Amino acid sequence: MLYLSYKLKNGSLQLLSSSGTNYPAISTLSENMTIVIPGLMKQGNPNVKATMEWGPIFRYTYNDAMLYLQVALYGIYNDKVITPYYYWTTVNDKRSIVSTYENGSFYWRYGTGYYLQFKPFKNEVLKLMVGGGFEREVISNSYGRHCYWWSPFKYGINFRKGNWGASYQGNIPSKMAVLDYRKADEPKSEFSAFYQKGAWRFSLYGMWMFAPAKYESRSFDNPIMNQTEQHIIKDNRRMLMLGVSYNFFSGKKKNIRKNINNYDSDAGAFK
């Protein structure tokens, strides 16, 4: 990993270059066949290989009493990306489609991301936030080259005065490539409020306040199958949660030392 930084007045310029390995999950490698629906089977491919991912990130940061801004430009390349693959077969004298995986040619994504925080009173009383990005995704596999746009957008407002506080966060979902499908971001419409007295905090949370929870996905373009899914949970609009917490460490000196950082990047994911 390469990291270079140049300090500016009220900000900085940073250049990062990183690389990593993406390992296939155990379910991606398993030859066990499962029935999704009659006529559609799902099976892993033990011949799928791990892929390498690398690319540069250029980031600009600005910070003063009223404004915090971060803008990034990036380009990430993945060789032999793991992508879905479909073919026809005969199971118990019936024609069926098998959904499996293969190593495609490449996956290339590039674009820009941004985050803006504005404090009109130059303190924590009121904060306005917006963030998002514009990303171009290019995937090349057995079915040709596919190009998509991903443009997430999120926003929020925080209020804090004395012992009271409240916030609201929302977003506009956009679809991005996730292994098998192009999946939409999870919709977000969350409200929270709290009152804090010493170590005690009393909270109220509301999720999906103005819209139901909605999850969408669509298979990549291919000549064999077009699969679209949509799940809507309307009851979540009435979800409210009350919370009471006590901080036993409030006002106490904390001295924590981290001795071990053990991370298993090759952990399997059973489905």
Q: What residue ranges belong to the model's regions?
A:
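Outer membrane beta-barrel strand-and-loop segments of large Gram-negative receptors
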Residues: 43-45, 49, 62, 68-130, ...
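Transmembrane beta-strands of outer-membrane beta-barrel pores
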Residues: 8, 17-23, 32-33, 54, ...
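Outer-membrane beta-barrel proteins
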Residues: 22-28, 69, 78-86, 125-127, ...
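Surface-exposed extracellular loop regions of Gram-negative outer-membrane beta-barrel proteins
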Residues: 9-54, 75-94, 211-226
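C-terminal beta-signal and adjacent terminal beta-strands/loops
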Residues: 197-271
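Transmembrane beta-strands of outer-membrane beta-barrel proteins
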Residues: 13-15, 56, 69-73, 110-112, ...
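C-terminal beta-barrel architecture of Gram-negative outer-membrane proteins
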Residues: 132-137, 150-196, 200-201, 205-228
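Residues that define the transmembrane beta-barrel architecture of outer-membrane proteins
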Residues: 50-56, 65, 104-112, 145-153, ...
